[in-house]
Amino acid sequence: MPIAKMKPVIWTIAINVLLMTSSTLAAEKSAVRFELHTNHIVINVGEQAFATYVFASDKITRPFFAHVHAPNAVQVTRNHPPQPDDSQDHATMHPGIWMAFGDISGHDFWRLKAPVVHHHFVVKPTTQPSGGTFTVENHYLATNSRQTVCVETCRYDILVRPTGYLLICSSKFTSNHDFYFGDQEEMGMAMRVATPLAVVNGGRILNSKAQRNGKEVWGKQADWADYSGTKEGTYVGMTLMADPNNFRHSWFHARDYGFIAANPFGVNAFTGGEKSKIHVKAGKSLRIRFGVLVHSNAKDKINHAANYRDFLNQLK
């Protein structure tokens, strides 16, 4: 009898060890890992590449994410720099995923005429149970690089979700003097998809109002817009989402050649209405937040509305 009673205990221990081992292996495979270099961070999920965050570059004078990969290891952003078989337009202005502004107090950070300088890490790259995070302080300098127009504190969260990799960008802009955000198409959070995903190569843009491709999506306000297509035999893409608590609902600047941006600033640019300025008083701040879901699910398996709700649930 004593021997018979011990057998279930032995099996229970063995099963618990197996469950713990499986759980540990799964956690390691989904763990966000950071490799900090002199001017960039290599971001991996487990042993697989996710993206490179470049915070200092001679040619691109603002931070950006390049070489962004979906969970199935297929790259979803255009090669940076563009390769011979890539479309060659906007080689420096469209490096992958970025936030930029064509007019802050008359200075153009989108077209690289005024620099954004990485000042320091407020929070160094840190792995968390649900993903990883880091926070940077960026200084937006005047065109002559002599004065600071404003200071951005930006938190990046990389979350491993059942539907893909979710990048959340939460920014706060402030200064010790007044400044303003102007009214242009080229403002906000943007991304350039891999060349095979562009609409002109068979890809598709779809927004939360079921409008499709550049002709219908451009200049329309929406909660999200997805840019997807087939690459290397699999369906991959990115969904650009705006926080509904931003100061204004975003319009989308969308192009069939592979570009899209979420822009809450462009009243005149997108509607033809009166040209707007978002003024920020000295000591006050403006906050904006966006998300990008990088996915590799089959086209008929994607529930964009559910993915957007999941994004909202992750906001802190």
Where do the model's predicted regions map?
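N-terminal secretory signal peptides that target proteins for export/translocation
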Residues: 1-7
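Beta-strand-rich N-terminal accessory domains
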Residues: 27-91, 161, 244, 299, ...
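Beta-strand-rich recognition/accessory modules
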Residues: 241-316
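Active-site/ligand-binding surface loops and adjacent short beta/alpha elements
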Residues: 181, 185-250
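Acidic (Asp/Glu-rich), glycine- and aromatic
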Residues: 53-57, 64-68, 161-207
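Beta-strand elements of well-folded, non-transmembrane domains
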Residues: 138-144, 156-160, 173-177, 193-197, ...
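Extended, loop-rich substrate-binding clefts of extracytoplasmic carbohydrate-active enzymes
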Residues: 91-163
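Bacterial N-terminal signal peptides
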Residues: 10-22
